[in-house]
């Protein structure tokens, strides 16, 4: 279950970081772009942790219900 939690948090982190980078102004200078990505990831980590704490119990409940329906 720890691997599932890690994958889930990575997906949330990537989604939030992507939206932060897309929403941020772009620049042709690669250093500025790297800093923007770094800042987006730093901002996304705490948000991903909060979302993960709420979403993982919901996902577990849904998986158990689906497992009962299928099995």
Curated annotation (Swiss-Prot):
Thermal dependence of catalysis: Thermostable. Still active at 100 degrees Celsius.
Task performed by this protein: Female-specific peptides with potent activity against Gram-positive and Gram-negative bacteria. They have as well hemolytic activity.
Listed GO biological process terms: defense response to bacterium; innate immune response; killing of cells of another organism
Record lineage: Eukaryota, Metazoa, Ecdysozoa, Arthropoda, Hexapoda
Name of the protein this chain belongs to: Ceratotoxin-D
Organism of derivation: Ceratitis capitata (Mediterranean fruit fly)
Location(s) in or outside the cell: Secreted
UniProt keyword Secreted, yes or no: yes
Residues annotated as signal peptide: 1-23
Keyword annotations from UniProtKB, A to Z: Antibiotic, Antimicrobial, Cleavage on pair of basic residues, Cytolysis, Hemolysis, Immunity, Innate immunity, Secreted, Signal
Subunit composition and interactions: Homomer of four to six subunits.
Residue positions assigned to the propeptide: 24-35
Record carries keyword Lipid biosynthesis: no
GO CC annotations, alphabetized: extracellular region
Main location: secreted
